[in-house]
Amino acid sequence: MKRRISIAIDGPAAAGKSTVAKRIAERLSYVYIDTGAMYRALTYRALACGVDIHDEQALLSLLRDTSIELKPSPHGQIVLVNGDDVTDIIRGEAVTNAVSLVAKHPLVREEMVARQRALAEGGGVVMDGRDIGTHVLPNAEVKIFLKASVEERARRRHEENLARGFPSDLEKLKEEIARRDRLDSERETAPLRKAPDAVEIDTTSLSVEEVVERIMEIVNERIG
Protein backbone atom coordinates (compact mmCIF):
# COMPACT_ATOMS: atom_id res chain seq x y z
CA MET A 1 0.00 0.00 0.00
CA LYS A 2 1.38 3.38 -1.00
CA ARG A 3 1.90 5.80 1.85
CA ARG A 4 -0.39 8.82 2.02
CA ILE A 5 1.56 12.06 1.93
CA SER A 6 0.91 15.79 2.20
CA ILE A 7 1.15 17.88 -0.97
CA ALA A 8 1.55 21.67 -0.75
CA ILE A 9 0.73 23.81 -3.79
CA ASP A 10 1.53 27.51 -3.52
CA GLY A 11 1.50 30.46 -5.86
CA PRO A 12 0.02 33.89 -6.52
CA ALA A 13 -3.61 34.69 -7.34
CA ALA A 14 -5.05 32.90 -10.40
CA ALA A 15 -1.92 30.82 -11.07
CA GLY A 16 -4.11 27.72 -11.38
CA LYS A 17 -3.58 26.33 -7.87
CA SER A 18 -7.15 25.30 -7.09
CA THR A 19 -7.87 23.72 -10.47
CA VAL A 20 -4.65 21.71 -10.38
CA ALA A 21 -4.92 20.79 -6.69
CA LYS A 22 -8.46 19.44 -7.18
CA ARG A 23 -7.31 17.24 -10.09
CA ILE A 24 -4.35 15.91 -8.10
CA ALA A 25 -6.60 15.12 -5.13
CA GLU A 26 -9.06 13.30 -7.40
CA ARG A 27 -6.30 11.25 -9.03
CA LEU A 28 -4.93 10.17 -5.65
CA SER A 29 -8.27 9.96 -3.79
CA TYR A 30 -6.87 12.53 -1.34
CA VAL A 31 -8.70 15.29 0.52
CA TYR A 32 -8.45 18.72 -1.14
CA ILE A 33 -8.12 21.71 1.19
CA ASP A 34 -8.59 25.14 -0.39
CA THR A 35 -7.10 27.51 2.19
CA GLY A 36 -7.94 30.52 0.05
CA ALA A 37 -11.62 29.62 0.32
CA MET A 38 -11.28 29.71 4.11
CA TYR A 39 -9.97 33.30 4.02
CA ARG A 40 -12.64 34.20 1.49
CA ALA A 41 -15.30 32.73 3.78
CA LEU A 42 -14.14 34.91 6.68
CA THR A 43 -13.95 37.95 4.39
CA TYR A 44 -17.51 37.32 3.21
CA ARG A 45 -18.77 37.06 6.78
CA ALA A 46 -16.91 40.24 7.81
CA LEU A 47 -18.44 42.19 4.93
CA ALA A 48 -21.90 40.73 5.61
CA CYS A 49 -21.69 41.58 9.32
CA GLY A 50 -20.22 45.05 8.83
CA VAL A 51 -16.96 44.16 10.60
CA ASP A 52 -14.02 46.47 9.81
CA ILE A 53 -11.56 44.36 7.77
CA HIS A 54 -8.69 46.51 9.09
CA ASP A 55 -9.56 45.65 12.73
CA GLU A 56 -7.53 42.54 13.56
CA GLN A 57 -9.14 41.83 16.94
CA ALA A 58 -12.65 42.21 15.54
CA LEU A 59 -11.81 39.80 12.71
CA LEU A 60 -10.28 37.30 15.13
CA SER A 61 -13.40 37.40 17.33
CA LEU A 62 -15.57 36.91 14.25
CA LEU A 63 -13.42 33.98 13.06
CA ARG A 64 -13.64 32.26 16.44
CA ASP A 65 -17.42 32.57 16.16
CA THR A 66 -17.47 31.23 12.59
CA SER A 67 -17.66 27.62 11.46
CA ILE A 68 -15.97 27.14 8.06
CA GLU A 69 -16.42 23.74 6.42
CA LEU A 70 -15.02 22.46 3.12
CA LYS A 71 -17.07 19.53 1.85
CA PRO A 72 -16.81 17.43 -1.32
CA SER A 73 -19.84 17.20 -3.60
CA PRO A 74 -20.52 15.71 -7.06
CA HIS A 75 -20.06 19.22 -8.49
CA GLY A 76 -16.84 20.01 -6.65
CA GLN A 77 -16.00 21.33 -3.21
CA ILE A 78 -18.64 23.38 -1.42
CA VAL A 79 -17.87 25.96 1.26
CA LEU A 80 -20.17 26.30 4.26
CA VAL A 81 -20.14 29.23 6.69
CA ASN A 82 -22.12 28.43 9.82
CA GLY A 83 -23.98 25.85 7.75
CA ASP A 84 -24.82 28.15 4.81
CA ASP A 85 -23.50 27.39 1.33
CA VAL A 86 -21.35 30.36 0.24
CA THR A 87 -19.40 28.57 -2.51
CA ASP A 88 -20.30 30.99 -5.29
CA ILE A 89 -20.72 34.25 -3.42
CA ILE A 90 -17.18 34.15 -1.97
CA ARG A 91 -15.82 34.31 -5.54
CA GLY A 92 -17.52 37.66 -6.18
CA GLU A 93 -15.70 40.96 -6.70
CA ALA A 94 -16.33 42.40 -3.22
CA VAL A 95 -14.71 39.42 -1.47
CA THR A 96 -11.92 39.13 -4.05
CA ASN A 97 -10.93 42.77 -3.56
CA ALA A 98 -10.87 42.50 0.24
CA VAL A 99 -9.48 39.03 0.97
CA SER A 100 -5.77 39.98 0.92
CA LEU A 101 -6.47 42.71 3.49
CA VAL A 102 -8.13 40.16 5.79
CA ALA A 103 -5.45 37.51 5.23
CA LYS A 104 -2.56 39.80 6.15
CA HIS A 105 -3.51 39.98 9.86
CA PRO A 106 -1.10 37.79 11.92
CA LEU A 107 -3.68 36.67 14.52
CA VAL A 108 -6.17 35.73 11.82
CA ARG A 109 -3.52 33.69 10.00
CA GLU A 110 -2.47 32.00 13.25
CA GLU A 111 -6.03 30.80 13.88
CA MET A 112 -6.50 29.73 10.26
CA VAL A 113 -3.19 27.85 10.18
CA ALA A 114 -4.18 25.90 13.31
CA ARG A 115 -7.40 24.85 11.58
CA GLN A 116 -5.57 23.96 8.36
CA ARG A 117 -2.97 21.84 10.15
CA ALA A 118 -5.73 19.98 11.98
CA LEU A 119 -7.39 19.19 8.64
CA ALA A 120 -4.08 17.87 7.27
CA GLU A 121 -3.24 15.53 10.16
CA GLY A 122 -2.52 12.02 8.96
CA GLY A 123 -1.59 12.95 5.40
CA GLY A 124 -3.54 12.11 2.27
CA VAL A 125 -4.15 15.80 1.58
CA VAL A 126 -3.55 18.30 -1.19
CA MET A 127 -3.54 21.83 0.22
CA ASP A 128 -3.20 25.00 -1.80
CA GLY A 129 -2.61 28.61 -0.81
CA ARG A 130 0.10 31.24 -0.48
CA ASP A 131 2.18 29.89 2.43
CA ILE A 132 1.50 26.16 2.61
CA GLY A 133 5.01 24.88 1.86
CA THR A 134 6.74 27.62 3.86
CA HIS A 135 4.49 27.91 6.90
CA VAL A 136 1.35 25.74 7.14
CA LEU A 137 2.89 22.39 6.13
CA PRO A 138 6.67 22.97 6.13
CA ASN A 139 7.25 19.21 6.29
CA ALA A 140 5.04 18.35 3.30
CA GLU A 141 6.62 15.58 1.24
CA VAL A 142 5.83 17.36 -2.05
CA LYS A 143 5.94 21.13 -2.48
CA ILE A 144 4.96 22.83 -5.71
CA PHE A 145 5.11 26.54 -6.56
CA LEU A 146 2.98 27.57 -9.54
CA LYS A 147 3.49 30.85 -11.32
CA ALA A 148 2.20 32.56 -14.49
CA SER A 149 2.33 36.02 -16.03
CA VAL A 150 -0.06 38.70 -14.73
CA GLU A 151 -1.65 38.87 -18.20
CA GLU A 152 -2.32 35.14 -18.31
CA ARG A 153 -3.65 35.05 -14.76
CA ALA A 154 -5.99 37.97 -15.49
CA ARG A 155 -7.23 36.23 -18.63
CA ARG A 156 -7.98 33.05 -16.66
CA ARG A 157 -9.82 34.91 -13.91
CA HIS A 158 -11.76 36.89 -16.56
CA GLU A 159 -12.95 33.67 -18.22
CA GLU A 160 -13.76 32.15 -14.83
CA ASN A 161 -15.85 35.19 -13.87
CA LEU A 162 -17.77 35.13 -17.15
CA ALA A 163 -18.43 31.40 -16.74
CA ARG A 164 -19.85 32.07 -13.27
CA GLY A 165 -22.03 34.88 -14.60
CA PHE A 166 -20.06 37.63 -12.82
CA PRO A 167 -19.33 40.97 -14.52
CA SER A 168 -15.66 41.15 -15.48
CA ASP A 169 -13.21 43.77 -16.77
CA LEU A 170 -9.93 42.31 -18.05
CA GLU A 171 -7.82 45.47 -17.61
CA LYS A 172 -9.17 46.01 -14.10
CA LEU A 173 -8.33 42.38 -13.28
CA LYS A 174 -4.72 42.90 -14.38
CA GLU A 175 -4.42 45.83 -11.98
CA GLU A 176 -6.14 43.94 -9.16
CA ILE A 177 -3.96 40.83 -9.54
CA ALA A 178 -0.78 42.95 -9.54
CA ARG A 179 -2.04 44.70 -6.39
CA ARG A 180 -2.78 41.37 -4.68
CA ASP A 181 0.69 40.12 -5.63
CA ARG A 182 2.21 43.10 -3.82
CA LEU A 183 0.01 42.66 -0.73
CA ASP A 184 0.67 38.91 -0.54
CA SER A 185 4.42 39.25 -1.07
CA GLU A 186 4.99 42.21 1.25
CA ARG A 187 2.88 41.25 4.28
CA GLU A 188 4.87 40.69 7.47
CA THR A 189 3.29 37.37 8.46
CA ALA A 190 3.91 34.35 6.19
CA PRO A 191 4.30 36.27 2.93
CA LEU A 192 4.00 34.61 -0.47
CA ARG A 193 7.35 32.89 -0.98
CA LYS A 194 8.60 29.82 -2.81
CA ALA A 195 9.88 27.24 -0.31
CA PRO A 196 13.57 26.38 -0.92
CA ASP A 197 12.64 22.73 -1.59
CA ALA A 198 9.60 23.46 -3.78
CA VAL A 199 9.50 22.61 -7.48
CA GLU A 200 8.58 25.70 -9.50
CA ILE A 201 6.31 25.31 -12.54
CA ASP A 202 5.49 28.20 -14.87
CA THR A 203 1.93 27.48 -16.05
CA THR A 204 1.66 30.42 -18.47
CA SER A 205 1.81 28.28 -21.61
CA LEU A 206 0.80 24.92 -20.13
CA SER A 207 -2.61 23.27 -20.08
CA VAL A 208 -4.10 22.15 -16.77
CA GLU A 209 -3.52 18.52 -17.74
CA GLU A 210 0.15 19.18 -18.54
CA VAL A 211 0.66 20.76 -15.10
CA VAL A 212 -1.17 17.88 -13.41
CA GLU A 213 1.00 15.30 -15.21
CA ARG A 214 4.23 17.06 -14.15
CA ILE A 215 3.11 17.11 -10.53
CA MET A 216 1.94 13.48 -10.62
CA GLU A 217 5.40 12.43 -11.83
CA ILE A 218 6.92 14.14 -8.79
CA VAL A 219 4.33 12.65 -6.43
CA ASN A 220 4.83 9.12 -7.77
CA GLU A 221 8.59 9.42 -7.25
CA ARG A 222 8.00 10.35 -3.60
CA ILE A 223 5.41 7.74 -2.71
CA GLY A 224 7.15 4.90 -4.55
UniProtKB/Swiss-Prot annotation:
Its EC number is 2.7.4.25. One of its GO terms (cellular component) is cytosol. InterPro entries: Cytidylate_kin (IPR003136), Cytidylate_kinase_dom (IPR011994), P-loop_NTPase (IPR027417). GO terms for molecular function: ATP binding; CMP kinase activity; dCMP kinase activity. CDD domains: CMPK. SUPFAM superfamilies: P-loop containing nucleoside triphosphate hydrolases. Transmembrane segments: none annotated. One of its GO terms (biological process) is pyrimidine nucleotide metabolic process. It catalyses: CMP + ATP = CDP + ADP; dCMP + ATP = dCDP + ADP. It is found in: Cytoplasm. It comes from the Bacteria. ATP binds at G11, P12, A13, A14, A15, G16, K17, S18, T19. Pfam families: Cytidylate_kin. It is an enzyme of class 2 (transferase). Keywords: ATP-binding, Cytoplasm, Kinase, Nucleotide-binding, Transferase. Belongs to the cytidylate kinase family. Type 1 subfamily. This is Cytidylate kinase. It comes from Geobacillus kaustophilus (strain HTA426).
